[in-house]
Amino acid sequence: MSTGFSFGSGTLGSTTVAAGGTSTGGVFSFGTGASSNPSVGLNFGNLGSTSTPATTSAPSSGFGTGLFGSKPATGFTLGGTNTGIATTITTGLTLGTPATTSAATTGFSLGFNKPAASATPFALPITSTSASGLTLSSALTSTPAASTGFTLNNLGGTTATTTTASTGLSLGGALAGLGGSLFQSTNTGTSGLGQNALGLTLGTTAATSTAGNEGLGGIDFSSSSDKKSDKTGTRPEDSKALKDENLPPVICQDVENLQKFVKEQKQVQEEISRMSSKAMLKVQEDIKALKQLLSLAANGIQRNTLNIDKLKIETAQELKNAEIALRTQKTPPGLQHEYAAPADYFRILVQQFEVQLQQYRQQIEELENHLATQANNSHITPQDLSMAMQKIYQTFVALAAQLQSIHENVKVLKEQYLGYRKMFLGDAVDVFETRRAEAKKWQNTPRVTTGPTPFSTMPNAAAVAMAATLTQQQQPATGPQPSLGVSFGTPFGSGIGTGLQSSGLGSSNLGGFGTSSGFGCSTTGASTFGFGTTNKPSGSLSAGFGSSSTSGFNFSNPGITASAGLTFGVSNPASAGFGTGGQLLQLKKPPAGNKRGKR
């Protein structure tokens, strides 16, 4: 019986305890041998062992006597080989102990084990182990192993498929050895934070489930009827056609939202049509008045600018004259005959006086004429008016003649400029033609008409829908007609109530959504919005999700029949994805049948 603090006391062949003897380790022991009696106290190395057959003949204590000794290792050992077939319980913290065929390892163990007769330190074996506790072992098994606690498994080995249920906190999952493939087919279900290959798993196992592929509207393709084919023996009547199935609630919600949006837009249009244009006209008048005031202010600012410039020039001239007078005063009288600056000053001053006198004379004459007219009290006669109009006409003729001469000069300069560009720059392009074309384009653009009812040209929605329905009845059928709601096998025409083709979603005169650019406008020769617009035999293009003769917006194989599964416009003659469909097959009218026996 060992008491106190012992380090690696032997159990087999020692003097104190015989092989398989009865011994109890008390207090604190490190690396004691396994016995049939329970151990008391705190020990590292006999954590859960049951029995030890005496098959070896030498004790190992502590850290062992060598790395390559031929002794069984109990306790904390590094190295050690086996001389025969042993059934040993690996206890404690072991590195490189012999491998066991059926053992229960408990406690904290780092068991890099190999089979007997070939064990080397830090080997990577394949064992059938049921590990519990805190273990960092290499337990790649070919049989199902239930590991609990904290395990770091699969650090080597060359076996393949395993079926492991890992619970607790485990580092690593079922992985083939370094010599095997990294992507073996395992059946391990993990949950929480986990990876199957050398990862970290937190939590318990969960059943593996595959996410279904969902299409438009949240429909699972795996449960769809398009997987059924005639080759598997299923009957055609087992699968439902798309027109007989209810639409997904997501698409129904989208259609309801679209109808609600159209209704709101119609209400806004009605409110705009009921508004009066007096407020807009008043705003226009205010803008005109403000423009006049702005022009007056601009003219005043321009006049003041000119006056300021004139005053600057006059001030500079007066400073110059003052300097001339100062120098003239300082010049002696005998030398002033050579100084001509005063003479120039007086000459310019006389010219200014002359101009001012002429202006005064003209103003005096105008004033005398006005006073004479007021004294005579004579009114303007028709002859005077005709004479004034003739003078104004002659003035306009003279101005037109001057404008014509200027225009001819500009044309000559234009030809010279174009010739210069062609000769020196080698550019024969008429640069004035592009400007002329742009000006013409701006002139030809229609102006925005303002008024109380901008949507007055909109036709009645019910009448348009009825006309569209009658037109479609007269045309040869291009596919199955919708039975309820909106069918994606046929275009978006007359499928909902009064129809979405020519009314509501953008008729040819609807200004709110743009001219000829609605969701299904019936304009001839114009391809508008659509997920695969279809060509009807009448020549009108309507937008839809593809009719039964085109493959505009499909989610499945175009080669299958159009009545099987969830197909969006699927048919045999497949056309481009989001483009306009090709020319449809023109079906002839059916021959006149035998009317015998019919009423």
From Swiss-Prot:
Sequence repeats lie at residues 7-8, 30-31, 44-45, 63-64, 68-69, 488-489, 492-493, 513-514, 519-520, 529-530, 531-532, 545-546, 568-569, 578-579. GO terms for biological process: mRNA transport; nucleocytoplasmic transport; protein transport; regulation of protein import into nucleus. It is found in: Nucleus, Nuclear pore complex; Nucleus membrane. It is a peripheral membrane protein. Residues 7-579 are annotated as: 14 X 2 AA repeats of F-G. Its main location: nucleus. GO terms for cellular component: nuclear envelope; nuclear membrane; nuclear pore. Keywords: Coiled coil, Glycoprotein, Membrane, mRNA transport, Nuclear pore complex, Nucleus, Phosphoprotein, Protein transport, Repeat, Translocation, Transport. Residues 213-247, 579-599 are annotated as: Disordered. Residues 256-276, 314-381 form a coiled coil. Transmembrane segments: none annotated. Belongs to the NUP58 family. Component of the p62 complex, a complex at least composed of NUP62, NUP54, and NUP58. Interacts with NUTF2. Interacts with SRP1-alpha and Importin p97 proteins when they are together, but not with SRP1-alpha protein alone. This is Nucleoporin p58/p45.
